Every structure is written in structure tokens, then in C-alpha cells.
Amino acid sequence: LIEENEFRETKKIEELVIAIDTSASCKEKLVQQFLNETGAILKHQESFFHKVHIRIIECDNQIQKDIPITKLDEIEEYPEQFSVSGGYGTDFRTVFSYVEKLRNSGELKNLKGLMYFTDGYGEYPKKPTDYQTVFVFYGDDTPQKTSSGETIKVPDWAVKLYLSEDTKG
């Protein structure tokens, strides 16, 4: 016999946060690449049979915009309505603090992960998250340097993903 529960679609909504670095060091072309990849991810997520709740956070050293996405038409409209906000320095910790506030308030109840599209220049959080965290970079995995010559160090607890011209959405 097949249990009734085996026929039910799960009601749990998967939640994903996509952060897009709009700081001054991210040139317009790079931000457009972030948008293209974000669009590809969102369309892929929506193709699953279950509901999704995605938040796109545009940020530099502060939260510039927080856009909730729950429907296919919103996914297609997002790049059309995008305009760069911010353009200051990057502090990744701002997004992580903001996500914690959303979780504590109940706005994010089942966070599966956070993808942060960035050039890598900025202040990283020291404390590991209890959800999967991926920093997405364009180019190869050659260690990047700050303007003062220091190697940029992504926290060990975060996944580093490098997208080349061949792997872009």
C-alpha cells in the first residue's frame, strides 16, 4: 500500500537569497553579468513543482533594495526594472545581518541558502552561517588582490564559485 503522504506535494516553501554587489568596484558590465546569471537561476528555480520564495538583495555597504520574487512574471520583469543603486564600498556583513533580521522576524522561515554575486572586494563576516553560503565570482580562481596588494580571503565556511565566459547563464 502507498501511504497518502506519498501523494501530497510538500507545502514547504524553499527560500533563497541572492545578493548582488552594486558597489563602486563592480562595473556596470559586471553587474549586468550578475543580473543575467540571477535570471537564469530564478527561471531554473521556478521550473520545479514546488513554490519558491526568493529575495534579491542589491547592496554595497548597505542594503539598497530587497525584492521578493514568488512568481514567474516577476522573474522576467526583474532585469527590465533594474537600475544600479549604491556605488559605495562593499561590506558583506550588512547582507548577513539583514538576513538574520528577516529570519528572526519570521519573514524567512526555511532559508536554504544565500548566493552572493560579487567581485570579492569587501569586508567578509567571520561567523559561519547555518545555511549554505556561496560567493560567486566571474573569472578564474586566481587569488584576487586588494588595492594595497593583500590577497582577498573568502571565509573557509563559504563555497567559492567561479564562473568563466564559458559557464555564464
Predicted regions and their residues:
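Hydrophobic, well-ordered secondary-structure elements that form the walls
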Residues: 21, 34, 119
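Von Willebrand factor
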Residues: 63-68, 74-123, 137-153, 164-167
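Short, T/G/N/S-enriched strand-turn elements that build extracellular solenoid repeat scaffolds
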Residues: 124-128
